Amino acid sequence: MEFSPFNGVVKLCLKGIQLEENGRHDEALSFFAEGYREASDDHEKFIAAYFVSRQQKTVSDRLKWLHIALDHALVISDDRTTSALPRMYLKICACYTSLGEEAMASEYARLASSYKNIPFDKGPFYHGTKADAQIGDLLVPGFNSNYQAGFKMNHIYFTGMMNGAGLAAALAKGERSERVFIVEPTGDYEHDPNLTDQKFPGNPTRSYRSEFPLKIIGEVAEWVKPGVQELEKFRDKLDQNGGEIIN
């Protein structure tokens, strides 16, 4: 599964998150549990189990579901879940601490600290835009945000997901055609803090940013595009949510 806001399990979890934020925890749990039942692969199961764990009323049950989520994540063990492991280990550590199991707590604290907050993702990487650019060009920071009027971005953003870049192109301002470029970072890059460990654990969208230019090394001809209605609903949600951009 490539993470997508249009994925059925992700949609169920998003509904649960909204209920959770409104204090309707039992209803939220029903959506998360339905997501786990309907999940068809380890990535979907990992996401749903993580949210089920948040609604457990006892530490033991929370720990049980965190281990279930972790088991699914370790089966995958790729760029979609590796970024979530430090937080998962810390949550498990906290459970063992509450239960008085210091040896297990120390082990999971050690596992959490063994991860540095740097991306392991080696690409390929993509950038979605409506800009008129060509192979060989450099995409640089300093342009206005597609999501907040008059806000100049200090970083250039990219993703390891082709379809995610396609969605970014669809959401970009302007009347030109949507384009998805294959890009190569020319310097260090980091997890996008606007998306990492926000609604979902880790960086499932494989979204990154850099203060250094991205070199265009190719262009994608086709990618999976959301339907018109889905895109409009998603755009409306972005407009409603607003929120401060971490720049």
Question: What do the predicted segments below correspond to?
Answer:
Residues N7-S30:
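Alpha-helical segment of the N-proximal tetratricopeptide repeat
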Residues N7-G8, R24, E44, D61, ...:
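Structural signature of alpha-solenoid helical repeat junctions
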Residues M1-F3, G35-D42, A73-S83:
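Flexible helix-coil transition and linker loops at the boundaries of alpha-helical arrays
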Residues S98, A103-G123, K130-A133, N146, ...:
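Conserved NAD+-utilizing ADP-ribose enzyme module
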